[in-house]
Amino acid sequence: MRMLLGSFAVYAAAALCEIGGCYAWWCWRRAGAGAWVLLPGMASLALFGWLLTLVDSDTAGRTFAAYGGIYIVGAIVWLRLVEGRPVTLRDAAGVAICLAGAAIILSAGRGAER
């Protein structure tokens, strides 16, 4: 259980970094922000990559697959809190399905392919 909670914390931090970094590019290209927003955006994306290496997993693919579910939750939270858009029933259903998938992958743990 401790590994799952630790992985979740790393995944949540990674999602914040990835979404924030990508949002900087979005703001520059689509919302008219100055190019200066790209510097913290790139730093955030670099931190995202480093954070994923902290997850206790034998394989990058399993780490990235489990992270995908957490990323989707983070993106929907971002939609609501940063962009001020409502979360729809379909958003919530999609999040639930993705979290179930991430939980299955995470619960397999190390050495699951044996």
From Swiss-Prot:
Topological relation to the membrane, as annotated: Multi-pass membrane protein
Subcellular location: Cell inner membrane
Transmembrane segments: 8-28, 35-55, 64-84, 92-112
Main localization of the protein described in the UniProt heading: membrane
InterPro entries (UniProt xref): UPF0060
Superkingdom to which the source organism belongs: Bacteria
One GO term describing the cellular component: plasma membrane
Keywords assigned by UniProt, alphabetized: Cell inner membrane, Cell membrane, Membrane, Transmembrane, Transmembrane helix
Coiled-coil boundaries: none
Assigned protein family: Belongs to the UPF0060 family.
Full protein name: UPF0060 membrane protein GDI3492/Gdia_2889
